[in-house]
Amino acid sequence: MVSTESIRQKSGVSSFFCDFSAMDQEQRKRHSLLVGELLPKHLEMKELPDGYAFRFPNDQVLFAGLSELATLEQLCCPFLTITLELQHDQGPTWLKLTGNDGVKDFLRAELGI
């Protein structure tokens, strides 16, 4: 993960930063593992007016992992709106990361978009 200070410098948005101190050591390890394992599995990324959406295959294990990641992410980044959506007829799973003005710049810096 990118350091808090480098995110602030890259994004130019000082009000958005990951507060990893909001998680204990075990949660930080798990968060890092889930980010590394799950995010590369996205099939598509869409830019939204207030953030980004990532399409994943419809898979129960993947959905459970994304749900756990969303819960941990909310601890360190409470300014994000995190939506996990299963679409009808066994369609894809969407993970949406959105928020107030400036969140999109933060996400670009954090995710290297």
Indicate residue ranges for each PLM-predicted region.
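A common structural junction motif
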Residues: 71-80, 111-113
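Secretory/periplasmic and organellar redox-cofactor proteins
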Residues: 1-63, 83-90, 94-113
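Amphipathic, interaction-prone secondary-structure segments
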Residues: 63-71
